Amino acid sequence: GKLKKWTIPFDYSVRKYGGDKSRKLSLMHPYIQVECAKFYESHDYYMLSLCSNSPFSIRYISERTKCIFKVEESETKEEEENLNRIEILDEEVDKLYRSYFSYKRYDMMYKFFTSGDYLRLEQKYSHLMKMDIARCFYHIYTHTIAWAVKGKEQAKELIGKETFENAFDTLMQHANYNETNGIIVGPEISRIFAEVILQRIDINVVNRLKQSPYSLTLGRDYEVRRYID
């Protein structure tokens, strides 16, 4: 029979090396994977635009990856080796095709803590605060994507309309039992979904801190680095 629009993901647990706690990850149903591919094809440039607004983010999609694969060594001249691979922005990322998008600025969190940027911030500021959004993906309300893209008032006016944000919302629901509370952890598209929402929060934070009673200026009084792992 015809496959339901909403699907059930395959869940499994992983444990970090040396850690005690496990974490639930999920694989999307193949039907939803195909729907995600169609969504990328239709909206990739808009997704890139929405992920380019935050001054805080240190891991975000920056451009479409070119589908160029490394050929067999026996067929490659040494001087051409660097041309026969997918386009990557960080030389340390492996040469295999990993993602539809290329990323800036750090693909792994530890690289930020060993970077010149981190050293500069240490020298500039006397205090460091670290924050974590616990179980972030599991608690994301999918309708929030509309608020992030269009604003809460306009989003209400566009409920049920065929818009990018409503399509993205529906896609994430269909990947996870048709639930609006939480998105699955693991797929790249989930991180992009969260990044769009958090970029809007980043901008709201900057604007709020400019106002009284804070009157704080980004780059002078404080700086923020945010990362989705």
List PLM regions with ranges:
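Conserved two-metal-ion catalytic palm core of "right-hand" nucleic acid polymerases
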Residues: G1-V185
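Short, well-ordered loop/turn elements at secondary-structure boundaries
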Residues: E122-S126, E188, L218-D221, Y227-D229
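Short acidic-aromatic active-site loops that bind/stabilize oxyanions
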Residues: I183, P187-R191, E195
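Active-site palm subdomain of RNA-directed nucleic acid polymerases
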Residues: F193-I228
